[in-house]
């Protein structure tokens, strides 16, 4: 069976219904132009993703998460993936600064949901409902993904706020299971989200690597401590 390898993860088939999702220590930014390896990053992303998936499942969000298979490995359900990234934004940061005349750090009065077509060749362009329809994705499917994404946002924002963390923005991916249900997939980690310390606005995510803001592992470990209440490795 074929192993699928991306920039930060490997998908290793277990059987017809499940994959091992292995998180790598690689970090990339700017469409792979900037690259590095950080020992322990894969473990942190796997454990953080597992924590968030468990939290969401407890709140009724269906995910592809089945269990933890090892330090940097999760067992996940095999899905027919949509070629989309669904991005939810609560605070102005990143590429949103280029599209709205608002300063970085501006708290949006309500979340913004954006759609991006997953394509390395096209650099993941932003699309709308009309583009999605051309790609064979129905408005009903898009609306369901947006509905789930906004519920995820509410759950994570509340959980993180109690731990002194601002959920700035994040991206989600979705797939369809064998019963035709739309299920939350991929990962939820500091690779795919922006997390800021509520007091200092210090980044606790991959922006530390993108913009040389400090030690990536220290930032990820701090996030891990706050969301789990444990020290990494304990």
UniProtKB/Swiss-Prot annotation:
Pathway: Purine metabolism; IMP biosynthesis via de novo pathway; 5-amino-1-(5-phospho-D-ribosyl)imidazole-4-carboxamide from 5-amino-1-(5-phospho-D-ribosyl)imidazole-4-carboxylate: step 1/2. Keywords: ATP-binding, Ligase, Nucleotide-binding, Purine biosynthesis. Pfam families: SAICAR_synt. One of its GO terms (biological process) is 'de novo' IMP biosynthetic process. The keyword ATP-binding applies. Belongs to the SAICAR synthetase family. Its EC number is 6.3.2.6. Gene3D superfamilies: ATP-grasp fold, B domain, Phosphorylase Kinase, domain 1. Coiled coil: none annotated. It is an enzyme of class 6 (ligase). GO terms for molecular function: ATP binding; phosphoribosylaminoimidazolesuccinocarboxamide synthase activity. This is Phosphoribosylaminoimidazole-succinocarboxamide synthase. It catalyses: 5-amino-1-(5-phospho-D-ribosyl)imidazole-4-carboxylate + L-aspartate + ATP = (2S)-2-[5-amino-1-(5-phospho-beta-D-ribosyl)imidazole-4-carboxamido]succinate + ADP + phosphate + 2 H(+). The gene is purC. CDD domains: SAICAR_synt_PurC. HAMAP family: SAICAR_synth.
